[in-house]
């Protein structure tokens, strides 16, 4: 079969127009290949994805790599299929880019099968409706906003409040305890963090169970807008063909939206609210609906979601909210108190915080903890104006317990050992419930609040109190 070859007619940043002969337009999402000598000396090293048809013989495409050095009239070859990435066990322990090429200098992937990155979401009849929680070993999450197996979890937070550290701790805890496969999509984040994650995974022995797919901050918007889909295709293979329970980590889903908005104006779309692309909800829906549990296996996804200027009503985080089963909101106010993980116990929510799923005891204690913290929040204005002495004895007790709960919600992380000097702690759910139940019941009213800071179980807090008393 003769190749369908077009010619570049216009280059505007990451968007390239290609002309074909009449009747030979490639379909939307098809991959075209062009030789760009400024990337490297290989043939057909630049992939373009067809995004629009312009009239009868021209397409508008998005480039997956640098377009510097391209010229008008250059040949673009239609591959006849969409961007495909290698899938299967050979991808484990490897770092791939958006088009599935390895970037870890460890030779070709050698996978037997490839999946296209644009795939249909599973049909309703194939989706599983079973609801069960899975334990992360992080107290604040397991108690107040538990994660559902096969669910979608969002980590919301502004810049520098600890989203990436929390994701790395989850990868560490879940890979150690859960033993299944993980896929990590680095979408538009810092290359340094991607490198750190790879090194840490190597050291902890988790790497051989994880596939890493990176499209980092320094890459063109085309790569950042598609890399999450590439990672998702790898996860779908493990779910559908091997019946695995896969974990998909995306850091950061906001960059997926941001990359879409960068190319949207160049594609000639009129921007909508706050300058985002008009197709924001559709693009997010196409990605999120593929992340689900089926009768064969499940994909549980944990997504870091950057919140621009700490504004949760911004269209990008607000659109992501609609798809989530649990939200873990990281708060700058809590980070300022030195409490890490800086999870807001009152803003974080979970669909499965329900006595029928997690049991009556867990539910009751979670609600009591939230009640005490909410009461403390309500009293803070009075304390700020009049001081603690003006409170009733009952309110003073509530404040003392709330401050202990607040500190007990902190926890030393394995991945932060280098910074804190404290060994990381994985806390079993039963120990978490027991600890908070004892604080709320007033068993530890005589223990100083510092004893609860950065410990694992309640027993450790009591031991720490003994050393403080000396």
Curated annotation (Swiss-Prot):
Its domain of life? Bacteria
Subcellular location per the Swiss-Prot or TrEMBL entry: Cell inner membrane
Presence of keyword Cell membrane = yes
Its name, as the record gives it, is: ATP synthase subunit beta
The record's note on quaternary structure and interaction partners says: F-type ATPases have 2 components, CF(1) - the catalytic core - and CF(0) - the membrane proton channel. CF(1) has five subunits: alpha(3), beta(3), gamma(1), delta(1), epsilon(1). CF(0) has three main subunits: a(1), b(2) and c(9-12). The alpha and beta chains form an alternating ring which encloses part of the gamma chain. CF(1) is attached to CF(0) by a central stalk formed by the gamma and epsilon chains, while a peripheral stalk is formed by the delta and b chains.
What EC numbers are recorded for this enzyme?
A: 7.1.2.2
Q: Which SUPFAM superfamilies match?
A: C-terminal domain of alpha and beta subunits of F1 ATP synthase, N-terminal domain of alpha and beta subunits of F1 ATP synthase, P-loop containing nucleoside triphosphate hydrolases
- Cite the InterPro entries for this sequence: AAA+_ATPase, ATP-synt_VA_C, ATP_synth_F1_bsu, ATPase_a/bsu_AS, ATPase_alpha/beta_chains, ATPase_F1/V1/A1_a/bsu_N, ATPase_F1/V1/A1_a/bsu_N_sf, ATPase_F1/V1/A1_a/bsu_nucl-bd
The species this protein belongs to is Geotalea uraniireducens (strain Rf4) (Geobacter uraniireducens)
Q: What is the lineage of its organism?
A: Bacteria, Pseudomonadati, Thermodesulfobacteriota, Desulfuromonadia, Geobacterales
Q: Per the record, what is one GO cellular component?
A: proton-transporting ATP synthase complex
Membrane topology, record value: Peripheral membrane protein
Its UniProt entry gives the catalysed reaction(s) as: ATP + H2O + 4 H(+)(in) = ADP + phosphate + 5 H(+)(out)
| Molecular functions per Gene Ontology | ATP binding; ATP hydrolysis activity; proton-transporting ATP synthase activity, rotational mechanism
Which sites bind ATP?
157-164
What are the UniProt keywords, alphabetically? ATP synthesis, ATP-binding, Cell inner membrane, Cell membrane, CF(1), Hydrogen ion transport, Ion transport, Membrane, Nucleotide-binding, Translocase, Transport
């Amino acid at each position: 079969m003769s190749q369908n070859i077009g010619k570049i007619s216009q280059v505007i940043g990451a968007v390239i127009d290609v002309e074909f002969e009449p009747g030979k337009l490639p379909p939307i999402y098809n991959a075209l290949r062009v030789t760009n000598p400024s990337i490297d000396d290989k043939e057909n090293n630049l992939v373009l994805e067809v995004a629009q048809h312009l009239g009868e013989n021209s397409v508008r495409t998005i480039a997956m790599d640098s377009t510097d050095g391209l010229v008008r009239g250059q040949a673009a070859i239609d591959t006849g299929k969409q961007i495909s990435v290698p899938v299967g066990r050979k991808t484990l322990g490897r770092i791939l880019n958006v088009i599935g090429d390895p970037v870890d200098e460890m030779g070709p992937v050698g996978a037997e099968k490839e999946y296209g990155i644009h795939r249909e979401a599973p049909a309703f009849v194939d989706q599983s409706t079973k609801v069960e929680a899975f334990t992360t070993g992080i107290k604040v999450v397991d108690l107040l906003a538990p994660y559902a197996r096969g669910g979608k979890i969002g980590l919301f937070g502004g810049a520098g409040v600890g989203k990436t550290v929390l994701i790395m701790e989850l990868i560490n805890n879940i890979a150690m305890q859960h033993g299944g496969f993980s896929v990590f999509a680095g979408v538009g984040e810092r290359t340094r963090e991607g490198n750190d994650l790879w090194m840490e995974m190597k050291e902890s022995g988790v790497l051989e169970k994880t596939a890493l797919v990176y499209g980092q901050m320094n890459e063109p918007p085309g790569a950042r807008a598609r890399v999450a889909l590439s990672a998702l295709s790898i996860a779908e293979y493990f779910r559908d063909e091997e019946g695995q329970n896969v974990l998909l980590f995306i850091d950061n889903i906001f960059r997926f939206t941001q990359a879409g908005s960068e190319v949207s104006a160049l594609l000639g779309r009129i921007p909508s609210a706050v300058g985002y692309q008009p197709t924001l909800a559709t693009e997010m829906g196409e990605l999120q609906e593929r992340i689900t549990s089926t009768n064969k296996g499940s994909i549980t996804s944990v997504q870091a979601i950057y919140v621009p200027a700490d504004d949760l009503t911004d269209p990008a985080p607000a659109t992501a909210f609609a798809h989530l089963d649990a939200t873990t909101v990281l708060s700058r106010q809590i980070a300022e108190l030195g409490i890490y993980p800086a999870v807001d116990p009152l803003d974080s929510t979970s669909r499965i915080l329900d006595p029928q799923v997690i049991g009556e005891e867990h539910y009751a204690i979670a609600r009591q903890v939230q009640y005490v913290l909410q009461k403390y929040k309500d009293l803070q204005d009075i304390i700020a104006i009049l001081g603690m002495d003006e409170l009733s004895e009952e309110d003073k007790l509530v404040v003392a317990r709330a401050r202990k709960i607040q500190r007990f919600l902190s926890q030393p992380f394995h991945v932060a050992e280098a910074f804190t000097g404290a060994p990381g702690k994985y806390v079993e759910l039963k120990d978490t419930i027991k600890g908070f139940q004892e604080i709320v019941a007033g068993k530890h009213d005589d223990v100083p609040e510092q004893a609860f800071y950065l410990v694992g179980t309640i027993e450790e807090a009591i031991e720490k109190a003994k050393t403080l008393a000396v």
